[in-house]
């Protein structure tokens, strides 16, 4: 039945996933957001190359590489607003393994499938 969890313990959150039939619209604009800096625990960590001082990507925004290969939806944002760090999480090692060689690659957000949080509202 699995490990016993205490009342306040946060169990491993399930990562959001895109609909199976999702495909990047051919003419959808993509914009650079950061670079893959680490791959840990079924997650791809992206250091933003753009300050988050005015806005940061909202969870569920769709990320991809320059060649338009889909990385996945944004799972969480952490770090300082000046240098936000984004995390895309996978629910299976198989999904994660597909990206094991992507360290150092530029990451983009899909403009029509992404939203921002303006930092004035979270400061």
What are these regions (language model features)?
Residues 94-123:
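Helix-rich interaction surfaces within compact, conserved domain-sized segments
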């Amino acid at each position: 039945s699995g490990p016993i969890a205490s009342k306040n313990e946060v169990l491993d959150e399930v990562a959001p996933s895109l609909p199976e039939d999702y495909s990047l619209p051919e003419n959808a604009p993509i914009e650079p957001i950061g670079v893959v800096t680490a791959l840990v625990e079924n997650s791809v960590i992206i250091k933003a190359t753009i300050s988050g001082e005015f806005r940061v990507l909202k969870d569920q925004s769709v990320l991809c590489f320059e060649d338009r290969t889909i990385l996945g939806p944004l799972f969480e944002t952490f770090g300082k607003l000046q240098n936000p760090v984004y995390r895309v999480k996978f629910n299976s090692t198989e999904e994660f393994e597909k990206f094991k060689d992507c360290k150092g690659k530029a990451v983009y957000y899909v403009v029509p499938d992404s939203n921002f949080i303006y930092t004035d509202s979270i400061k």
